[in-house]
Structures are given as C-alpha cells and as structure tokens.
C-alpha cells in the first residue's frame, strides 16, 4: 500500500464506523495561544475533551499534520541520525467524546491493523498501565492476544495527562516486531519491551481518558470517559511497505532521491551523505508545511523554530560541499508530492519557494563567519569536549545555535559540555533578570501597589469622555503625598476615569482636570497602567490638588477622536494585508497615537506599488461603506471560535473584548474605536519598509492628516506641472522624457571626458621627466573626477612600464589626488605615502596601497607648489 492509500484506508475505516472525518487543522494552533505548534491529533479537539466546546458529532477521525521541534516535544537534534525521528509527521487518530470506550477502541485498532492492513498477529505486542487490569483483560478477550505479549509499564510510559490537573488516564500502546534483522547493531539480544525503537516499533497509542485529576492530585472518574488515539503515518507506512526506516517509505524517499539528483550524489554511497539526505528530506517537509500555514523565518517564537529547522538543513548540506541554494526547489517538490491529501499546497508553492530562497541567501551571508570562528576555536581544544564557556561564546557572540554546534562537533568527534553551557546560559539569564527587575523596580513603585490594593480604577472611557472622579492618590518622586501645589509635576490616581491608559500599542489619553467649581486645576499629559488595574495620570498641576478632592476629568476629544480613527484603521490595515498578501500575515507590533498609526507585520518581502495601492484601496473601500463597528464581551474560547484574531503569546482573561467590522475584520482588542468606519474619513499609507528579517512596517495617517497629505501631494503635482508647462495627466510622461534626455547628456559628457583623458596621455607623455631611467609626472588636471584620473594613471603606468604618476584636480574648492607607482618601484616609492605627503600640503589627508593611492584636501592654493616638489621627492628615493 502507498502512504496515501494507508492514510485513506484509515479514514475510510473509521468513517464506516460512524466517525466524522475531520480535516487536519493548521500547524499554527487556532484555539491555543500557549501551544507553539500542533503536535498531536487531539490538539484541535482539546476544548471538546475539556467540555468547553460542543460539536455535532461524538466520534471523529483525522490525519493531522504535526511538528515537533520546540518546547517539550523536540525531536530536532535526532532527525536524520535515527530511523524514525521527524520534525514534521502525520498523526492518524480516532476520537470518542463520551461515546465508546476501551473495548471498542481496542477492537477498532485490532481490526484495522490485522484485517485491513494485514499485519500478522503473532508480531504484535501490547503495553498497558501497571494498574489497568481492565485493559489487560479486554486485550485478551477482544483480540485473543496471549497474556505473554501484554506488558504492564509504569506511569511514565503508559499514563497520559493534559496538564497538572484535568482530564487524564491510562493508555495502551501497540508495538510491532520487525524481526531480528531490524535490530540495531549490538542490540540483537534485546527483547520486548527493553528494545526501544530498534526491532520493536510502537505504532499506535490508545489513550483512555477516564479521570479528572484535581488540585490535590486525586483521580476522580469522569462522567463520560473519552478516547484519544494516535498512530504515526510514517511508521505504519514503513511496516506495511517492508522498510526498516521511515525515510525509505514512498512518503519521504522520493524527496531524498530528488535532493540527491540536485546535489549530484548517490543515496547509499556513504553514511554521512545519507544522513544529510535524511535531514534535508525531513526539513523540506517541515519547511513547506510551516510556511504554507503562515510561519515566516524570524528570530522569535514559531519563526525562530522554522529558521532553526531550515538552517540545520542548509548547514548540513554545506558539510558535503553543496553551497548553492537548494531548499526552495525541494519545498516545491514536497508540495507536488503531497497535493493529493493537501491540495491547498498548490496555492502557495511559489510563495513558499520565495520565502525559502530568501532565507537561504540570508543564511549564506551569516553562516560563513560563524563556521570559521567555530573551526578556529576547536583547534585549541584538548580532549574530546568543547568547554561550555567557549560554546556559549559561539552562541552568544556569533549566533551559532547550540544544536548547530552539536552537529558540527559530532562531525569532529567532539561533544559539548552541556552542563557548563547551561551554567553560562543561566548566568546570562540571571543578569538579564537582575537588569529587568532593577528597571521594573524603578518604574513600579510600592505606592502603586498600595493604591491598587485599596481599589482598582474603574475605566469609563469606552462610553464617557468626562466624569466626576475622586482623587485617591498623589505620587511625587515615587512617594505618596497628600497634596501637590500649583506648578508641580505629579502622578494622580482617580477612583474612576474616562482616560485610556496606554496599552496594546495605543497611547494614553490627554486632557484636563477641573475642580468642582469649574476651575482648571491640571493638564493630563498621559495616562498609563502603574500596575494591572490601576490607571495613573501624569499631570502638570495648575492649582493645588489634594487626596480626597472631587474633580471633573475631561478627555481631549479631538486627540481621542484622532487616536480611535487610527486604531480602527489599524484593524482595517491588518485585514487588508491578509487579503492582499496572504493569511501568513500576523501582527508583530503596533503604535497608535493621534498623529499616525504604525503597524509591524510578518511578511517575507517588501510590498510593490501595486500591492500597496490595493491595500490602501481595500481600507478606503471599507471606510466608504460606513460599516458599524461592533464590540462584544465574550468568553475567550467563544471569541476564538468565531474567528477573532489573537496574538500569540498574549495573555487573555476568561472574558475578552472583540472589536469587529462585520464581514471584514475581527480582533481581540481593548482599545478605543470609531462607531462607524466612515468616521475614519480617509486612510493614506505614507511608509513601508523592513525592520528585521521577515518583519515589515507600514505607517499610515487618517482623517484630517490624510486629507492634508492628499492636498499637499496634489498641490505639489500641480506646481511641478506648471513649472514644466504640461498638463497634470501628461506630467509623468514628460518627466520620463526629461530623465532620458538627462541620461543621454550625462553619457555624452562622460564620453567627452574620456576623450579628454586620452588626449591628456599625449600631453603628459611630453610633460613627464625621466629621473634615473624612470618616467615621473606630477600634473594639475582640472575638469577630471577621481575615476577618470585613476583610469588615466593606469594608462600611463601601462604605457611607461616603470613610472611614478601623480595627478590632481580641483572642483568646488576641493582637491582630489591620485598617485600610482609601477610594481617594480614600490619598494622605493610608496604611492600611499606619496599621496599622504601631498595631501598634507593642501590641508587634507589620505593614503593607500604601495602601487595606488588616493587623497584629498581643502586648500588648493598650495597645490601647484606641492606638485612641483614631487619630482625632487621621487628623485631622492630612487
């Protein structure tokens, strides 16, 4: 059976038994911001198991794409060196949500592998949790497997739990005996269950989710036990196709063959090349699927893990002498190979190839330096261990990742002292923590903590822009005070406030505080969260203020309006970018203030003019629709389920605020927004550029600022058109002609200068003096630039064979000097020193090689005298 047939037979088997076949979810978890990558089939059903989500089916089956290359489940360093470790793999699974339980799960698994897949029963072994008598009995009763092939293992191997508390339960694993010929060298004598992954291969894990572990650790029976199973497609394919290693299956080996063809090598020729081919094949699969699902190489989070995977492949290929880009060719091949079960891959093949090739070029420029430093460093090592301090320096200073170092060390028969490396790493973390804590203490005063303990600030600003409030705290120089005089700079805390405290990229509000009598008592310069739940107002007092005073807090409406226009426009920008560029676009940072919006996002290349125009058009189209902006307070799970975008790594409470432009944008957001998109007026992109690898930045303006920009641009276009006496529609064509004419004239000037330079050869030949058999010329040639003088000096050297040439020109009061010496004379006359000496005479400096040098100066008054002196200087040296 082919790999695709094995996958399809699995899904069909369970569909025939009442299971809903559910498509694989993305490798980027949609409902779990705490999870780096989807790493198991049950991830997309997590909330169903937890009882937080209801679906219209109680049985499911899937073939889930998974990545394990970071965090708890990290197989990266083993990939390529073992038979069955992968970064990317597919997990076949069947699930029961309170429907069938152990007996049916065991029966289904046994029927599929022995009847549909045809595995011989006598080669199958089973493990159960040491206390799970029920499972052991069911295995014998349902399948007939003898007790001698059922083994009880401890909690580490055969008990599964989702977390410290919550659903958990015992599990059973099915293993297959590949035969003694599959045993790893030296392990032929091992018997099940001692042989871990050599002769005996785990193929299917059945989790019996029957308990709920509480805070005390007690296991309480679940009212509706569930089933979660997982079988690696690559593993079962290897068994059914008679292969010892997963890499020889038709799911992966075609990639190995294609890579070998690109590299000009033969699979099986030598161990090292085979290891590299396995690494490349696996990492090409991971790269293709991760980039397709929206991950972009970067220096943090998921992007960092992807970069590690890609660079591990690139570095290993360099070790067999291949330096040209190749990975982008393999990702396209993977897309074609996997298009049957994943037809959506065809839509992104070009994008994935482009991202991959860009990363390959970026790597080529950075790795060479790090590799050279590593190779130089290990020359001084005594013994077989690289000291942790040296390894940490390579990591910290030169960016050579530890896993890359370990692979490189392995090639030299060396190992890294991980313990001392970890010590160095922890010391750096402690330094960082100490620095952070010091900064934190400087910013967060004890006064804030005391105030928030007395009561949190009530925020009224979503619906109110002014409010009567009571002063509950005043802080000056980090100390609480009871009152402040007029003219004081202070921090003020109110019991309730309409002022938005800076967060989520949106700046804090400005405004005014009034006394009960209507007197203006303070300017509010900004508001910020001193600690969570406490809004601190930074003020300039205009009159005395005391704790307990009742004030009227009034937000500066024009500034708030401008800010919320920009904030809603940021959401429109984000949605438009995802429409134009693809769903891989994710927010990487933002700033929203009254004057502009700045939005950082993940993308692999700069936007061209057409893309920027389309993004801007979509934003303004939605503004013209004047859609009502909706805000809802929802449970986090419900908000995510409705498609609201959440930022990876952000911590959200149980209840979240969802801001929606129906049919266009939906995000989790705590900021302030317009009531209708039409309130934005107009949006204009004013900047697009790169801020780091894989991260772009756009700046835009809205409302009156955008209108002014359009007016200024229109006015400038009209003035230019008037200056050149053409209509505005004809302006671009006219300017293009002007530029073409200018370039033609510049070319003519260059040609004339070259002719003058060639003509100068003859005059300088006549002007040159012969000193001790050497041609020497020192000439003042105005009208020539440095490049022309350099070319002229070369011509004279080539013509004269043995010569010293010094040329100078003056332009705009600045002196340019070129000195050239033929190779036979450099031991006596140094061109760099000659130029330096001449430069000093004209108030400048310079120097260069013994045979060619440049210099300059700012005092041309002494130039001719200095040139005359060159002859005597050269004569003294010959």
Curated annotation (Swiss-Prot):
SMART domains: tRNA_SAD
PROSITE patterns (alphabetical): AA_TRNA_LIGASE_II_ALA
Superkingdom as given in the UniProt entry: Bacteria
Any Pfam family: DHHA1
One Gene Ontology term, aspect cellular component: cytosol
Gene3D superfamilies in alphabetical order: 2.40.30.130, 3.10.310.40, 3.30.54.20, 6.10.250.550, Bira Bifunctional Protein, Domain 2 (3.30.930.10), Threonyl-trna Synthetase, Chain A, domain 2 (3.30.980.10)
Location, primary (coarse class): cytoplasm
Protein name (Swiss-Prot/TrEMBL): Alanine--tRNA ligase
Originating species: Solibacter usitatus (strain Ellin6076)
Lineage start: Bacteria, Pseudomonadati, Acidobacteriota, Terriglobia, Bryobacterales
Gene (UniProt): alaS
